[in-house]
Amino acid sequence: MASLPSSARCVIIGAGIVGNSLAYHLAELGWTDIVQLDKGPLPNPGGSTGHASNFIFPVDHSREFADITLDSVRQYKELGVFTESGGYEVARTEERMEELRRRMSSAKAWGIPAELVTPEQVVEKVPFLDPSVIIGAAWFPT
């Protein structure tokens, strides 16, 4: 562990997605006197970011959120830390399936690659899922 300085221009508490993003963007703006603290050792200090799936769904309810997400993907690619693995959002209720249909309409309108798939298509890639409890899914290649 690095020793802590007695003072800093900026002290960031947390090394999760928000803290790391803040440190990155401040450094991009030319800040150099930054200290970042977290409760545990990196790369997984034990906070909520480390418990997340780390999958990026590029289509949300607004174009603004979709644009922010796509910009995040661009930044991760530039940093060389992005793995394009693809993923499913699975619907087990008709209400959830209707939400996925709305998001697919947005994806198509915004030019974002995504598609609705059948339970059988999901199980081809994720064989431990029970297709009898899935109505359908959205596939995102990012």
Residue ranges and their predicted role:
Residues L26-A27, A107:
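Hydrophobic alpha-helical packing residues
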Residues G46-S53, L129-D130:
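Short, flexible, mixed-charge acidic loops at enzyme active sites
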Residues F140-T142:
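Glycine-rich "substrate-gating" loop/helix at the edge of Rossmann-like oxidoreductase active sites
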